[in-house]
Structures are given as C-alpha cells and as structure tokens.
Amino acid sequence: MAQAIDASKNSPSDPRNREVVFPAYRDPQIGDLETPINSSPLVKWFIGNLPAYRPGITTFRRGLEVGMAHGYWIFGPFAKLGPLRNTVNANLAGLLSALGLIIILTGALTLYANSKPPKPVKSVATPNPPEAFQSSEGWNNFASAFLIGGIGGAVVAYFLTSNLELIQSLFGG
C-alpha cells in the first residue's frame, strides 16, 4: 500500500499532482491567488453581475439594489425568529427591527465613506472594480441609496408577509 502511494506521488501523469493554485496573473508580488474557484468563468460571471460590480450602472442604482436585497432578507429572521414570533405583532416587530439594522448599516457605510477609504484593488474575481468605490462621494451616494433601498425592501417584505392570505386568494391558492 505504501509503495503504491509513493509511486503516485512521483508520477507526473497523476492528476492529483497537478498544480491548481497559482499566483494571480502569474505574479507573486500581487499577493493574490488564482484558484479553480475564483478564476473559473462561472464565478467571474456571477460576481461580475452582482450590483456592486456590474458595469454600466450608477452609484445610486448600485446602492438601491443592494439595499433592497438586504432590507428584504433582513426582515424575515426578525419577524419569524425574533422574540415576538408567535404574536400578532411579529411582522411589525420584524419590520421595525429590520429598519433599525438598515439605519445602523447605513451609518457604518457613511462612517466608512468619511474615513477616506483606499481605492479598490483589482483581483482575480473582480478585474475591473467600479469607479463608484474610488471616492468618499461615491461611497456616500451608495450609502444614501442603500438606506432608501433597504427601507423599501423591508417594507415590501412586511406587506407581502402581512397580506399573505389576500395574495394567495388572488392567485387561487
């Protein structure tokens, strides 16, 4: 058994002996690695289509999309897993909690924007970081749009959850 293992370690044709992790762009000075995950076309496509990295959209729209998604999904855990989960006011408590967290997150984004953040670094997965994240003004625009989108996303989730029976009756469910 040990002899077979030693034989496979020394065989260049064995696929387990192939290198799969390389320095980014084959330059070890960059300090990033290309792995089969972060350099695959599927992952690059997925990350490139996220609102933060999608080319051709404004800073305000980036913040609005990210805020709407966060407001929408933050509502659920507060409403359905919070301490008031089995009460009549569970959805309202979830909405208010989600709004509070969105406001805290917006404050954190604003603080970051005012701290003179460094310019984004080009990486394997994001070879072209957007211009929006290269200035304090861009980050402030992103933060204000995040607040609007976050509030909107949480309110939409609240109305959908609170009126679930009505929505189901409209669609025959």
Swiss-Prot record:
InterPro entries given in the database record: PSI_PsaL, PSI_PsaL_sf, PSI_suXI
Biological processes annotated in GO: photosynthesis
Keywords: Membrane, Photosynthesis, Photosystem I, Thylakoid, Transmembrane, Transmembrane helix
Entry's Gene Ontology cellular component terms: photosystem I reaction center; plasma membrane-derived thylakoid membrane
UniProt-listed Gene3D superfamilies: Photosystem I PsaL, reaction centre subunit XI (1.20.1240.10)
Keyword field contains Hydrolase: no
Mode of membrane association: Multi-pass membrane protein
Membrane-spanning residues: 92-112, 142-162
Statement: the UniProt record of this protein carries the keyword Thylakoid: yes
Family per similarity comment: Belongs to the PsaL family.
Protein name, per record: Photosystem I reaction center subunit XI
Gene that encodes the chain: psaL
